[in-house]
């Protein structure tokens, strides 16, 4: 049966501002012997740069940096489902959907269904003629597609997306990926309600296991969100879309803007130094959304205007106390004035407390959304809390 991988009703298209900020640059730490120099060519149509920090310091507005150039493709039909159209959109440096589909056919696949294109290429559900099992094809000609494939070839974990094949047709790379039932955001949308703590715990534990594996290999995902978590059911969960990943991460540094505004950690939004703890923040946002759907962590239904405005909304919604801001950071110097003192520091966030979430869930959310990244526990530490019953 053709399973669904519905990218069309995601917040990244309709509600929240999706952005692979520097996502095409993120994997440039891998395979330097094979891909030396490719990172210089990694760019987005709206953000061509080799050093994210340079542009951030220059004050480049977020509407340029935080961009998803496939946003204009969406069409909502009468049934509320969506499909991407409009090959005039330049998602992949001029590779149209028709051209990508022809390449997939030339590589021996029968294309069954187009999916919403991402910044790294055109995406299809397909299968080999005569075979029942379906796969997902990501077809792209940007260096980032090749680099994501090279990264996936290094990975082997039940909770991280695997790579079935990596094929090439001239300058175009085709990644052959497993086809899951849906992503977590679509799962929540289809059930139109939150998960209970038992199921939410199973999902987030799998995500944390995948993150612990990546972080153990010094890989930072940088775009952990419900749309990038794929599942068959709550016991079969996979963290995917490593197009924004950064490798060889050791000490905190400013690795550029990447990911999605609404799930970015405060240190990224403030353009401070950061490390793998940003993925733990993203997982905390995911846990909140699974338990509080359709509510969002910062409140409101409109997409974030830009990163700084979202950060201000976040500080106010959570009721972050001035003492919780990390010292000697731009986060403190520029944003502490938006903090409040109506809540004691290092206690449950106001936003979470008002919703009456399960006690275990509220505790995990607070830990993963610890505002100071130095105090924020790692994925491994959270997995060892001893409170998991799922």
Curated annotation (Swiss-Prot):
CDD domains, per database record = PKc (cd00180)
Pfam families, A to Z:
Pkinase (PF00069)
Q: Which PANTHER family match?
A: CELL DIVISION PROTEIN KINASE, KINASE, PUTATIVE-RELATED
Looking up InterPro entries in the UniProt record yields: CDK, Kinase-like_dom_sf, Prot_kinase_dom, Ser/Thr_kinase_AS
Q: Signal peptide span per the entry?
A: none
The record's SUPFAM superfamilies line, in alphabetical order, gives: Protein kinase-like (PK-like) (SSF56112)
Catalytic activity annotated for this protein? L-seryl-[protein] + ATP = O-phospho-L-seryl-[protein] + ADP + H(+); L-threonyl-[protein] + ATP = O-phospho-L-threonyl-[protein] + ADP + H(+)
**Protein task:** Multifunctional serine/threonine kinase that plays a role in several processes including egress of virus particles from the nucleus, modulation of the actin cytoskeleton and inhibition of apoptosis. Phosphorylates UL31 and UL34 homologs, two critical regulators of capsid budding from nucleus to endoplasmic reticulum, thereby facilitating virion egress. Modulates and redistributes host components of the nuclear envelope, including LMNA, emerin/EMD and the nuclear matrix protein MATR3. Phosphorylates envelope glycoprotein B (gB), probably to direct it to the cell surface.
Name by which UniProt lists this protein: Serine/threonine-protein kinase US3 homolog
The family assignment reads: Belongs to the protein kinase superfamily. Ser/Thr protein kinase family.
Instruction: Please name the gene that encodes this protein.
Output: PK
UniProt-annotated location(s): Host cytoplasm; Host nucleus
Keyword Transferase among UniProt keywords: yes
| Source organism, top-level taxon | Viruses
UniProt record, GO biological process:
regulation of G2/M transition of mitotic cell cycle; regulation of gene expression; signal transduction; symbiont-mediated perturbation of host apoptosis; symbiont-mediated perturbation of host chromatin organization
**Which residues constitute the catalytic centre?**
223 (proton acceptor)
Q: Give the E.C. number(s).
A: 2.7.11.1
- Recount the PTM note: Phosphorylated by UL13 homolog; this phosphorylation regulates subsequent phosphorylation of UL31 and UL34 homologs by US3. Autophosphorylated.
Q: Has keyword Transport?
A: no
Q: Which UniProt keywords apply?
A: ATP-binding, Host cytoplasm, Host nucleus, Host-virus interaction, Kinase, Modulation of host cell apoptosis by virus, Modulation of host chromatin by virus, Nucleotide-binding, Serine/threonine-protein kinase, Transferase
Q: Name one GO cellular component term.
A: host cell nucleus
Query: Any idea where the Protein kinase domain is?
Result: 109-389
**Residue sites binding ATP per the record:** 115-123, 138
**PROSITE patterns per UniProt:** PROTEIN_KINASE_DOM, PROTEIN_KINASE_ST
Any single GO molecular-function term of the entry would be:
cyclin-dependent protein serine/threonine kinase activity
């Amino acid at each position: 049966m053709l399973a669904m991988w519905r990218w069309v009703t995601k917040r990244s298209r309709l509600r929240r501002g999706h952005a692979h900020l520097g996502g095409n640059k993120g994997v440039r730490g891998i395979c330097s012997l094979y891909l030396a120099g490719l990172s210089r060519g990694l760019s987005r149509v709206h953000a061509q740069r080799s050093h994210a920090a340079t542009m951030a310091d220059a004050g480049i507005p977020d509407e340029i940096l935080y961009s998803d150039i496939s946003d204009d493709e969406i069409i909502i039909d009468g049934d509320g489902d969506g499909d991407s159209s409009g090959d005039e959109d330049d998602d992949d440096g001029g590779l149209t959907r028709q051209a990508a589909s022809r390449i997939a056919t030339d590589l021996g696949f029968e294309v069954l269904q187009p999916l919403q294109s991402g910044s790294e290429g055109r995406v299809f559900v397909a299968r080999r003629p005569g075979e029942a099992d379906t796969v997902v094809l990501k077809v792209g000609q940007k260096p980032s597609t090749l680099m994501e494939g090279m990264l996936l070839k290094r990975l082997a974990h039940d909770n991280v997306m695997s790579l079935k094949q990596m094929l090439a047709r001239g300058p175009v790379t085709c990644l052959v990926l497993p086809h899951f039932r849906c992503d977590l955001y679509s799962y929540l949308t289809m059930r139109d309600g939150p998960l209970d703590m038992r199921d939410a715990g199973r999902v987030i534990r799998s995500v944390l296991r995948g993150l612990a594996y990546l972080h153990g290999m010094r890989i930072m995902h940088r775009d952990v969100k419900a749309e990038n978590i794929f599942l068959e059911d709550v016991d079969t969960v996979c963290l995917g879309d490593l197009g924004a990943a950064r490798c060889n991460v050791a000490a905190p540094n400013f690795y550029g803007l990447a990911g999605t505004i609404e799930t970015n950690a405060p240190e990224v939004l403030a353009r401070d130094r950061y490390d793998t703890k940003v993925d733990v923040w993203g997982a905390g946002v995911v846990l909140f959304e699974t338990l509080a759907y359709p509510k969002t962590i910062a409140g409101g239904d409109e997409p974030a205007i830009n990163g700084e405005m979202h950060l201000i909304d976040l500080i106010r919604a959570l009721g972050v106390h001035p003492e919780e801001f990390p010292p000697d950071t731009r986060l403190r110097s520029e944003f502490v004035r938006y903090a409040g003192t109506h809540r004691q520091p290092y206690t449950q966030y106001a936003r979470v407390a008002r919703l009456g979430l399960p006690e275990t869930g509220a505790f995990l959310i607070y830990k993963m959304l610890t505002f100071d990244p130095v105090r924020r526990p790692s994925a491994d530490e959270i997995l060892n809390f001893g409170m998991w019953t799922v």
